[in-house]
Amino acid sequence: MKRDYYEVLGVGRSATKDEIKKAYRKLAMKYHPDKNPDNSEAEEKFKEANEAYEVLSNDDKRRRYDQFGHAGVGSSASSQGGPFGGGGTGDLGDIFSAFNDMFGGGARGGGSPFGFEDVFSGGGGRRSRSAGVSGSDLKIRLKLSLEEIAKGVEKTLKIKKQVACDVCNGTGSKTGELETCPTCQGTGEVRQASKTMFGQFVNIAACPTCGGEGRVVKERCTACHGEGIKQGETTVKVNIPAGVEDGNYLTLRGQGNAGPRGGMNGDLIVVIEEVEHKIFARRGDDVVYNLTLSYADMVLGTKVDIPTLEGRVKMTVPPATQPNTVLRISAKGIGHLKAPGRGDHLVRVNVFVPKDPSHQDKELLKELNKSVHMVPDEKKEHEKGFYEKVKDIFS
């Protein structure tokens, strides 16, 4: 029985073309016959990866495969396909790029001709697959406040999705049993031989009767109409780390839609949506708060209560603080996603200018303005360049 092409390459069903190409090249370099002489198992894995890549790298074939499984691309993906195979029509750029990775860099450097450091680094695990077609991935958006993002949070999500039918236990059969497909005798494949002037060719395709599963439902379950799945609701707990950003996503393996007739579950993709805060702005892992003070407080200095993500804290504003000065409260910002520690809480200080001062206020200001200390020194103001002033704002 053919394995699921996404499983062969070790990628999810929502994988991008670049992710598919990267996964394929890693497998092709690992199992290439030149690196595994007289190894029949490696040869089969190499052919399998070629076949999967030929389908998933082609938009039309991938669409048909996603909709109909192996039956939708039966005649197009032979075991010899793919950019390294005899019958494939893969991207020539991939061919030369992959061969250069395999045989180029290492040989020029005098080391291993295969560059094992690159070949075997990184990578991800593959998921095992039970019988049946895989369930589809499920994508949801999760709104988070800045307070939740700052520390990380555990969320319990109620999700509507396809679940295994509880009447037939997901088999799709009224009796709970599946029978061997009479067309392919349980192999999931059909073979067609044709003779040409070059010899006999055998084309292997997914069985049209069972869709490549090797089993068929004789007596369908009436609750799920033989599909083995139905619409349901489930609860999932997800741990969101501190420091995530809008658009980041987490993939929960096997938490997506159930596969028909015992097929493996798809993945649940949780996309983060950051809710705009009422009084704070985010700048990386720092939090910015705008504080407006009176002219007197700016000149004389003062102590104020400052709101932060963890509550209010006391902060001293020094005398002669200039407009747009940024004061820093360390480690009161957002937790770093990929490192220990937290960002800072930045307080940008500005002066309050009354729009409708009283007559008495105006007279007092006129008297105050007579002082030489209250009039800006134009020469000193222009001694600092523009970029130095900007630097002062964000220092």
Swiss-Prot record:
Record's superkingdom?
A: Bacteria
**Residues binding Zn(2+) 2, per UniProt:** 181, 184, 207, 210
In alphabetical order, the GO MF annotations are: ATP binding; heat shock protein binding; unfolded protein binding; zinc ion binding
Give the cofactor note text.
Binds 2 Zn(2+) ions per monomer.
Q: Specify one Pfam family.
A: DnaJ
What are the ranges of the CXXCXGXG motif repeats?
A: 165-172, 181-188, 207-214, 221-228
**Localization (cell):** Cytoplasm
Record-annotated J domain positions: 4-69
GO cellular component labels: cytoplasm
Query: Which cofactors is this protein said to need?
Result: Zn(2+)
Positions that bind Zn(2+) 1:
165, 168, 221, 224
Q: Could you tell me the keywords of this UniProt record?
A: Chaperone, Cytoplasm, DNA replication, Metal-binding, Repeat, Stress response, Zinc, Zinc-finger
CR-type zinc-finger residues = 152-233
InterPro entries, A to Z = DnaJ, DnaJ_C, DnaJ_domain, DnaJ_domain_CS, HSP40/DnaJ_pept-bd, HSP_DnaJ_Cys-rich_dom, HSP_DnaJ_Cys-rich_dom_sf, J_dom_sf
Q: Name where it mostly resides.
A: cytoplasm
Q: What does the entry give for GO biological process?
A: chaperone cofactor-dependent protein refolding; DNA replication; protein refolding; response to heat
Q: Give the multimer and partner information.
A: Homodimer.
What role is this protein assigned? Answer: Participates actively in the response to hyperosmotic and heat shock by preventing the aggregation of stress-denatured proteins and by disaggregating proteins, also in an autonomous, DnaK-independent fashion. Unfolded proteins bind initially to DnaJ; upon interaction with the DnaJ-bound protein, DnaK hydrolyzes its bound ATP, resulting in the formation of a stable complex. GrpE releases ADP from DnaK; ATP binding to DnaK triggers the release of the substrate protein, thus completing the reaction cycle.
Q: Report the domain remarks.
A: The J domain is necessary and sufficient to stimulate DnaK ATPase activity. Zinc center 1 plays an important role in the autonomous, DnaK-independent chaperone activity of DnaJ. Zinc center 2 is essential for interaction with DnaK and for DnaJ activity.
PANTHER family for this protein: CHAPERONE PROTEIN DNAJ (PTHR43096:SF48), DNAJ HOMOLOG 1, MITOCHONDRIAL-RELATED (PTHR43096)
HAMAP family tied to this protein: DnaJ
- What does the similarity note say? Belongs to the DnaJ family.
Indicate what this protein is called per its UniProt record. Answer: Chaperone protein DnaJ
Its gene? dnaJ
